[in-house]
Curated annotation (Swiss-Prot):
Residues 224-236 have a biased composition (Low complexity). One of its GO terms (biological process) is positive regulation of mitotic sister chromatid separation. It is found in: Nucleus; Chromosome, Centromere; Cytoplasm, Cytoskeleton, Spindle. Residues 73-85 have a biased composition (Acidic residues). This is Chromosome segregation and cytokinesis defective protein 1. Residues 70-89, 94-183, 208-249 are annotated as: Disordered. It comes from Caenorhabditis elegans. Residues 12-48 form a coiled coil. Residues 109-126 have a biased composition (Polar residues).
């Protein structure tokens, strides 16, 4: 059956066109106003944050700030009149001075960085990350992230343990010794597949020898069967034996 024709009411079509135009205009106006309000809010918030920063640090590059953030970055309440800022300064919550004072010798021993005689507080924070070498990775079975020199090989420290991989479950998987300098080679006659991993040739035991032997046996059996058929045809039809046939019951 042909598809039914959609009946359109002229009055409904005209009303829909009118509403569509008005709704599109309202949406465009809403987008413009929303963008203006967002820009005004962002500008006001930026001005408020910048007003709390000292003028000498406002043009500081972000990388320099992240590398060594200054202690007097924000305007204190007592410095508001001296700096001449009109905005209200936001005082940063910091612990009291006696709480921040630490022993210079203890700080130097902890951070391994000499501290000056006049420095009453430790403003340098050193984050020391433990270095994981091959021995630690082998003892704890922690996989090392792949890199240019560690990818594709076992990172065990001992030479005699480089031919195995220990899984987190404790299973030991033997691996062939990889020789990156060894070139590729073609498979031999008795091999089915030969491929290379990291330049070390690995060969899957093929079935070419057994398959060839089976094919030769099948060819011989076919030839012997054909020869026997030819000999039987040349001998003529078979004659039943009538002598001493005996009696049938």
């Amino acid at each position: 059956m042909p598809p039914r024709k959609i009946k359109k009411d002229p009055a409904v079509v005209a009303m829909a066109d009118t509403l569509e135009t008005r709704v599109k205009d309202l949406l465009e106006e809403y987008k413009k106003k929303l963008r203006e309000v967002a820009l005004q809010t962002a500008k006001a918030e930026s001005d408020r944050i910048i007003a709390t920063i000292k003028p000498k640090y406002r043009d500081m590059p972000i990388m320099e700030f992240l590398a060594s953030p200054p202690d007097d970055f924000y305007i204190e309440s007592g410095e508001e009149e001296e700096e001449g800022e009109a905005a209200v300064a936001v005082k940063q919550e910091l612990p009291s001075e006696p709480d921040m004072e630490i022993d210079d010798a203890a700080a130097a021993q902890k951070t391994s960085i000499p501290i000056g005689q006049n420095s009453g507080r430790n403003t340098v924070q050193v984050k020391q990350e433990p270095e994981i070498d091959d021995d630690a990775a082998h003892e704890t079975s922690i996989p090392i992230a792949p890199s240019g020199q560690n990818s594709g090989r076992n990172t065990a420290a001992d030479e005699h343990r480089r031919n195995e991989i220990i899984t987190p479950a404790g299973q030991v998987l033997p691996l062939p010794t990889l020789q990156p300098e060894k070139p590729f080679r073609a498979p031999h006659v008795d091999e089915e597949i030969a491929f290379s991993v990291n330049g070390s040739p690995l060969v899957l035991a093929g079935r070419t020898t057994a398959t060839a032997a089976g094919k030769e046996n099948r060819k011989k059996s076919k030839k012997s069967g054909a020869a026997s058929k030819k000999a039987a045809a040349a001998a003529g039809p078979l004659q039943p034996e009538t002598e001493n046939a005996g009696t049938s019951v």
